[in-house]
């Protein structure tokens, strides 16, 4: 969606930064709602055995309320941008889209969600949807490979190497040993530890560190849900906090729009704090 946002804001002569930050933070907040929303949620879904619909029932309200909070914060932080309500005409005609591809994508998504709702294993449901898309594709492999952002893949390869090195040297284990007493307290303490670890070693390694510990908690389900919520929303704290943030920043940079680390913090920090407060409060009531 980054090219789409840039195209619209440039056509309307608006500052693209607030909309790009809104796009990235919304992607992170929205992904908290389901097991398939992001990689760490999938790990938690497999490890915890929480049914797909139950997981969504607990965390979808966090995503909805979090979206509302993020919108309000962006409007306040960039009030000058949103105070000007006069929008010029973009001069474009009707929007064109590839209807068969849209239908195929919706059907594949529906098959996956139906399988997950019926209790099918997460990997099997995802592979079934992917297989449906593969056997009906018409795009040549060369074109697909040409659209891959190889520089971003190299960046993530390096990031995972650094994370792996920290684990091999025992640095993450020592850090987790210090944080473990707080994590075992559950609730806000567990969420805080999840946020800190997610921004130090990334959210997926943080969840993997917690995986052997959570079954020992007094209420493992509540702990898993708190961990899913906190490690996901932690991605909004900094520009480097999530894959969505990095993809947005990289694609914007390629098109001449630079989202700086400091600029992102202006909205990222309050959005993270507000959504975490919502998540902790909600799970404290329903968990």
Predicted regions and their residues:
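Transmembrane helix boundary and interhelical junction motifs in multipass membrane proteins
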Residues: 1-5, 35-41, 122-124, 200-210, ...
């Amino acid at each position: 969606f980054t090219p789409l946002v840039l195209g619209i804001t440039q056509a309307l002569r608006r500052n693209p930064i607030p909309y790009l930050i809104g796009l990235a933070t919304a992607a992170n907040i929205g992904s908290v709602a389901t097991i398939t929303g992001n990689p760490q949620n999938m790990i938690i879904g497999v490890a915890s055995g929480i049914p797909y619909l139950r997981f969504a029932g607990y965390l979808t309200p966090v995503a909805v309320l979090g979206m509302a909070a993020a919108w309000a914060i962006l409007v306040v932080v960039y009030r000058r941008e949103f105070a000007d309500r006069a929008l010029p005409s973009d001069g474009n005609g009707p929007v064109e889209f590839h209807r068969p591809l849209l239908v195929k994508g919706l059907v594949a998504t529906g098959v996956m969600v139906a399988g997950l709702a019926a209790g099918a294993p997460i990997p099997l449901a995802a592979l079934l949807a992917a297989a449906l898309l593969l056997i009906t594709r018409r795009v040549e492999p060369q074109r697909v490979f040409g659209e891959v952002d190889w520089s971003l893949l190299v960046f993530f390869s390096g990031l995972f190497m650094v994370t792996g090195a920290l684990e091999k040297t025992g640095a993450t284990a020592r850090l987790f040993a210090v944080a473990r007493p707080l994590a075992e307290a559950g609730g806000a303490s567990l969420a805080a530890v999840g946020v800190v670890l997610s921004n130090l070693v990334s959210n997926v390694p943080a969840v993997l560190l917690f995986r052997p510990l959570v079954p020992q908690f007094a209420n493992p389900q509540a702990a898993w849900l708190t961990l899913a919520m906190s490690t996901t929303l932690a991605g909004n704290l900094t520009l480097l906090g999530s894959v969505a943030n990095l993809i947005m920043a990289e694609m914007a940079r390629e098109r001449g729009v630079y989202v700086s680390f400091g600029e992102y913090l202006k909205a990222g920090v309050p959005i993270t704090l507000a959504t975490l407060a919502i998540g902790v409060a909600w799970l404290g009531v329903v968990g």
